Amino acid sequence: MFTLKKSLLVLFFLGTINLSLCEEERSADEEERRDEPNEMDVDVEKRFLPALIGIAAKALPSLLCKITKKC
């Protein structure tokens, strides 16, 4: 009976250590996630700006033609 209690106590102790390590990893992951939205904004800007430049490049000649009336 004593060995059973002792082994259960050891398992409980090891389990609490594992849980505390998992919580530390979670908090580190949460800190990394806080940084990710900024990176996502940069990715969105990288995707948005080339599309905007492409649209402007297509529309600019016709706009200049209409303004200067030299078509």
Curated annotation (Swiss-Prot):
Q: Which family does it belong to?
A: Belongs to the frog skin active peptide (FSAP) family. Brevinin subfamily.
GO CC, alphabetical: extracellular region
Q: Which GO terms describe its biological process?
A: defense response to Gram-negative bacterium; defense response to Gram-positive bacterium; hemolysis in another organism
Superkingdom classification of source: Eukaryota
**What is the name of this protein?**
Brevinin-1P
- What InterPro entries does this protein map onto? Antimicrobial_frog_1, Frog_antimicrobial_propeptide
Cell location? Secreted
Q: Disulfide bond: present as a keyword of the record? A: yes
* Source lineage: Eukaryota, Metazoa, Chordata, Craniata, Vertebrata
What is the residue range of the signal peptide feature? Answer: 1-22
Main subcellular localisation: secreted
Question: Its function?
Answer: Antimicrobial peptide.
The entry's note on the tissues where this protein occurs is: Expressed by the skin glands.
Q: Name one Pfam family in it.
A: FSAP_sig_propep
Which keywords does this Swiss-Prot/TrEMBL entry list? Amphibian defense peptide, Antibiotic, Antimicrobial, Cleavage on pair of basic residues, Disulfide bond, Secreted, Signal
Q: Which organism is it from?
A: Pelophylax fukienensis (Fukien gold-striped pond frog)
Propeptide positions: the record gives 23-45
What are the disulphide bonds in this sequence? C65-C71
